[in-house]
Amino acid sequence: MRECISIHVGQAGVQIGNACWELYCLEHGIQPDGQMPSDKTIGGGDDSFNTFFSETGAGKHVPRAVFVDLEPTVVDEVRTGTYRQLFHPEQLITGKEDAANNYARGHYTIGKEIVDLVLDRVRKLSDQCTGLQGFLIFHSFGGGTGSGFASLLMERLSVDYGKKSKLEFAIYPAPQVSTAVVEPYNSILTTHTTLEHSDCAFMVDNEAIYDICRRNLDIERPTYTNLNRLIGQIVSSITASLRFDGALNVDLTEFQTNLVPYPRIHFPLVTYAPVISAEKAYHEMLSVAEITNACFEPANQMVKCDPRHGKYMACCMLYRGDVVPKDVNAAIATIKTKRTIQFVDWCPTGFKVGINYQPPTVVPGGDLAKVQRAVCMLSNTTAIAEAWARLDHKFDLMYAKRAFVHWYVGEGMEEGEFSEAREDLAALEKDYEEVGVDSVEGEAEEGEEY
């Protein structure tokens, strides 16, 4: 079996975890108490959903997941919520004091007290796996636990499980709205620390998702529940090929092989279609061509940036539902003829396709319409460098005045770490710039240097 272990860190990670597991349970027909009426084989570990759920002798299905937060309130909601019986109490780990939006607290002072406990729980989960394929880590960039503790955990996972892939789902600080003043510091410190430990990081920015909820679902004031359910759909689409049988299935390592041209350039942009409310869906027939085109609209992206200004390096289309290869090929052929979509010249084909016959499931009483087919596009584009540039600029404004730095130094960090992290991100921006340059020009320039 190719099992995946999900690790949800901090408030954002835990709340997205709730949305994801709620959706997985609905998709697989697993009840909140872990029973699965449709699964006749007790303890049989060969069903494809066993990548995400382990099965006890009593026929109970337990998520292969760990929830960690440095303060108890958010995880307590899981402990008392609808799905409280689904999780083993040991999978829900909380500390007593908050990381207080401070990377240094999450990474050094408070994080180090709890990290061994978390790794121990992860080890117990990995012992139940026959062929662990990797970890999915959910966290935010802006919070103290999400930035500091997640990066500490990933460093330690690299030591203990060197060869296993680690995929991140990270909540990137929104351009306009901010939940903490020190977000730019935390984001840049965590990106610098995890850059070498993460194999692939899918970024999601709250503002982009707010806009999608407002525009496509007509929700005037989207709540985090609305956002998380939408994020849940996306995560579900990315992991669907691991949990269901399909025509063209995609494995965790396959994402990396097809999306990451260079180790550092591992931040694919995620687009999902169709996001549509129930009343609208009733009147529209969403064909494969339509949803494929929708993926290339910046309005459907999960991070605010404009791919029309950048170039695509690789593109992964994950279809689910009533989709046949013939339609997909036709849709992609049409996309390739459009001038607005530019690929780097060193990557001529650039499309990888996955097809899964399980149609998208929606949460009852949610905002999304039940549709016959959906697509999630993961694209590695140079445009995402805009997001880094934005963040770096905010960091520079604050760091020039050394604002708030004493909180970090007081928790045992050194000021040198700030400048080191900032230099690393400057290098990352440069890397993105260089991949986008056409190779022919590049060769000519190299000739002049010698």
From Swiss-Prot:
Q: Which reactions appear under catalytic activity for this entry?
A: GTP + H2O = GDP + phosphate + H(+)
Enumerate the SMART domains for this protein: Tubulin, Tubulin_C
**Xref: InterPro entries:** Alpha_tubulin (IPR002452), Tub_FtsZ_C (IPR008280), Tubulin (IPR000217), Tubulin/FtsZ-like_C (IPR037103), Tubulin/FtsZ_2-layer-sand-dom (IPR018316), Tubulin/FtsZ_GTPase_sf (IPR036525), Tubulin_C (IPR023123), Tubulin_CS (IPR017975)
Residues recorded as binding Mg(2+), renumbered to this chain, are 71
Record Pfam families = Tubulin, Tubulin_C
Question: Where are the catalytic residues?
Answer: 254
**Family, per the entry?**
Belongs to the tubulin family.
User: EC no.?
Assistant: 3.6.5.-
Cystine pairs annotated here are none
Tell me what PTMs the record reports for this protein: Some glutamate residues at the C-terminus are polyglycylated, resulting in polyglycine chains on the gamma-carboxyl group. Glycylation is mainly limited to tubulin incorporated into axonemes (cilia and flagella) whereas glutamylation is prevalent in neuronal cells, centrioles, axonemes, and the mitotic spindle. Both modifications can coexist on the same protein on adjacent residues, and lowering polyglycylation levels increases polyglutamylation, and reciprocally. The precise function of polyglycylation is still unclear. Some glutamate residues at the C-terminus are polyglutamylated, resulting in polyglutamate chains on the gamma-carboxyl group. Polyglutamylation plays a key role in microtubule severing by spastin (SPAST). SPAST preferentially recognizes and acts on microtubules decorated with short polyglutamate tails: severing activity by SPAST increases as the number of glutamates per tubulin rises from one to eight, but decreases beyond this glutamylation threshold.
Q: What is the name listed in the Swiss-Prot or TrEMBL entry for this protein?
A: Tubulin alpha chain, testis-specific
For this protein, the record's Gene3D superfamilies field holds: Helix hairpin bin, Tubulin/FtsZ, C-terminal domain, Tubulin/FtsZ, GTPase domain
- Site positions per UniProt: Involved in polymerization: 450
Organism superkingdom: Eukaryota
Q: Its GO CC terms?
A: cytoplasm; microtubule
Q: Which cofactor does it need?
A: Mg(2+)
| Domain comment as written in the entry | The MREC motif may be critical for tubulin autoregulation.
| Tissues where this protein is expressed | Testis specific.
Signal sequence extent: none
